[in-house]
């Protein structure tokens, strides 16, 4: 049976972001029944489906700094941020009040609902070839896998093979019915198994190449995401295999040393660095929920700033000590470039390099990182190391430099690296009169399930300890 659906608005997202009575805090609104393959492609092409990779969890990490009082108009401080962001930054056990919406949860499940409709129905659509309909379905599978990867990394403990089968993950919904009640949380292992199943199935039906930009998925989109999934699972051999398979076809890097700040006092158009849709590094594009992500919303921490060398164009182009004509006490994050939160060449280089350093050939790890650095740092990007632990540490530092403020990848990295005492990090947020501390593996690394969702499933769903 076809699902009544508004293919123009995709879903009533304005309603979704407000209070609504549903076990998942989502509320689809039907106005039209999709019939053709083109209708279903419109659904997965909608702007709201292209947004993925929530940014607010970054405030739990060691990458960001917020002053007690905002330094200037438009910049953030503890006196100007929302109550929920302040609670995150100060590691409060409560994050959202009863009347506050958690857009990460609600928008993720809204997208999952949309993709479930497409997965279930598109092959029966009129018009369109079987190959076209299979590609649409494959992309919906990739979309669903990526949403679940973010959800399970936000609302559950990090994947640990020893405990993943017992650790509570997130509700795993694989159909288009949101009327279900009394839901339970699938285990972390179960969620990861479904993510891999979706990606494996998607790969068989997606094309190798597409015409146009990378907003639509190819086989390499599925392979690239699989590399990220296996890295999260600590399966370095499989992560390396998947990353290398994509790098063999996509090894182009943007040379940031050729770009510059063209409007030092500006915001949009401050640099001539291209957005993701015009960036040759983009393999599969998703944007952060907000137009320019965390631009002007956060200050890089001292520990992050100290990782960048002189001549590192990531610091030159994406950070500034002046904002809106005012000199600030410290650099602010102001790239004003629409970055890609899905699959890109630099992340795959870093996945492959980390896996080579752990289970592969150390010179390959260095070669990958040095190639990336040659496209990021003027004159002196090359590094020579011989000790395996030193190489691994350097790769992890490079990952932090390159992926700073990209969705909440740093939070995922902290959670996975905290499982290894060699890399465990105590996060400290220092204010004028108070310091807030988040020890390794603290339960506050895991976001709480929204309170409205818990009320609808009070007898079957467990809340995260914080």
Question: Where do the language-model regions lie?
Answer:
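Short, surface-exposed recognition loops and adjoining beta-strand edges that mediate ligand/DNA contacts
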Residues: 30-35, 63-71, 157-166, 170, ...
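Conserved, well-structured interaction surfaces
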Residues: 82-155, 186, 199-209, 336, ...
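Membrane-proximal, proline-rich intrinsically disordered regions
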Residues: 20-67, 304, 380-381, 420-466
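Extended ligand-binding clefts on enzyme/binding-domain cores
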Residues: 37, 41-57, 190, 233-345, ...
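Inward-facing hydrophobic residues that define packing positions of alpha-helical scaffold repeats
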Residues: 112-115, 192, 199, 243, ...
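Sec-dependent bacterial lipoprotein signal peptides
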Residues: 1-20
């Amino acid at each position: 049976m076809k699902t009544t659906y508004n293919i123009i608005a995709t879903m009533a997202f304005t309603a979704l972001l407000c209070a609504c009575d549903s076990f998942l805090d989502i509320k689809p609104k039907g106005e039209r029944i999709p019939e053709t393959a083109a209708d279903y492609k419109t659904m997965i092409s909608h702007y709201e489906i292209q947004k993925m990779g929530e940014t607010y969890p970054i405030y739990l990490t060691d990458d960001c700094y917020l002053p007690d009082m905002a330094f200037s108009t438009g910049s953030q401080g503890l006196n100007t941020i929302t109550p929920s962001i302040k609670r995150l930054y100060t590691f409060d056990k409560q994050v959202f009040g009863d009347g506050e919406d958690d857009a990460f949860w609600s928008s993720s499940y809204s997208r999952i609902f949309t993709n479930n409709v497409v997965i279930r129905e598109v092959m029966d659509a009129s018009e369109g070839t079987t190959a076209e309909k299979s590609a649409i379905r494959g992309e919906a599978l990739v979309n669903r896998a990526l949403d679940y990867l973010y959800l399970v990394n936000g609302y559950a403990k990090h994947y640990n093979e020893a405990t993943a089968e017992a650790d509570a993950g997130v509700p795993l919904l694989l159909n288009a019915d949101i009327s279900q009640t009394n839901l339970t949380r699938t285990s972390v292992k179960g969620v990861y198994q479904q993510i891999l199943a979706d990606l494996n199935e998607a790969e068989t039906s997606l094309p190798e190449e597409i015409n146009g930009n990378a907003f639509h998925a190819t086989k390499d989109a599925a392979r690239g995401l699989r590399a990220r999934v296996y890295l999260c699972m600590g399966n370095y051999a499989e992560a390396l295999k998947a990353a290398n398979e994509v790098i063999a076809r996509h090894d182009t890097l943007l040379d940031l040393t050729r770009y510059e700040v063209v409007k030092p006092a500006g915001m949009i158009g401050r640099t001539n660095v291209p957005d993701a849709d015009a960036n040759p590094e983009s393999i599969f594009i998703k944007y952060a929920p907000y137009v320019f992500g965390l631009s002007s919303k956060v200050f890089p921490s001292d520990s992050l700033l100290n990782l960048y060398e002189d001549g590192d164009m990531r610091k030159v182009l994406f950070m500034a000590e002046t904002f809106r004509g005012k000199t600030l006490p410290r650099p602010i994050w102001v790239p004003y470039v629409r970055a890609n939160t899905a699959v890109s060449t630099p992340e795959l280089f870093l996945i492959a390099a980390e896996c080579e350093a752990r289970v592969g050939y150390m010179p390959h790890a260095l070669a990958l990182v040095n190639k990336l650095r040659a496209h990021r740092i003027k004159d002196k990007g090359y590094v020579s190391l011989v000790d395996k632990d030193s190489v691994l540490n350097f790769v992890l530092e490079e990952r932090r430099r390159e992926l700073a403020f990209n969705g909440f990848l740093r939070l995922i990295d902290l959670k996975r690296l905290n499982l290894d005492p060699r890399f465990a990090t105590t996060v400290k947020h220092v204010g004028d009169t108070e310091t807030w501390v988040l020890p390794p593996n603290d339960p506050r690394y895991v976001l709480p399930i929204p309170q409205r969702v818990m009320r609808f499933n009070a007898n079957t769903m467990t809340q995260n300890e914080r």
